[in-house]
Amino acid sequence: MEYSFPRYLLSKQSVDDRALNRTVLDSLKANLPATPIRIIEVGAGIGTMLTRLLRWELVTKADYILVDEMTENIQTAREWIPLWAVEAGLGVERIEQDLLRVFDQARDVRIRFECAEVFDFIQKKPAPADLLIAHAFLDLLPKPESMPRLLALTKSLAWLTINFDGVTSLEPTIDAALDEQIERLYHATMDTRPTRLSKNHVFRQNASPMVGQSPDYSL
């Protein structure tokens, strides 16, 4: 079977559901401003975080900008989110190719699809959001150089979830030598991971773990 990154993102929804820090999620919910709110998600993939927030009723009335640099992801999001919404009992209105509305009596969310590198998107100087989301994405960026530009996308709140912290554990131990080799090779790919971000924007590439002082960081 040919590898499909959108299929991978779709298949791991339940894994991410369980991995998200619910204490941080409760804190986020308590600090969100009154609706409607403006949300920007970078590295948004096919939109599984958006549908998760709708399922969990964290987002009820919002403008949601879904940003990803992979054309395949954005195309899948355009097609999959309406199908998901119908199955969830939500109404769907296609306003434009890249503007979708999903709604019912309790929820009304307008979704804009942006196929762009995150720093190209930032250079457009979009209006800051009430909430910035980056899910399993920060470890793709050079840090700390990229953080001021990324955080300029939000007025105050940032929910930056499931980030590689430089540590890998394989359990249970079956072959310690093999585990060590797998860990070493995996960490090498994280240290040298090529992205289009580094080609078009000048940053010093490193693999330092993200250290956050805000309660909005989810580990």
Language-model features, listed with the residues they occupy:
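Class I SAM-dependent methyltransferase Rossmann-like catalytic core
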Residues: 1-34, 46
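A conserved beta-strand element that flanks and buttresses the S-adenosyl-L-methionine
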Residues: 133
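A short, conserved alpha-helix within the catalytic core of class I
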Residues: 140-154, 162
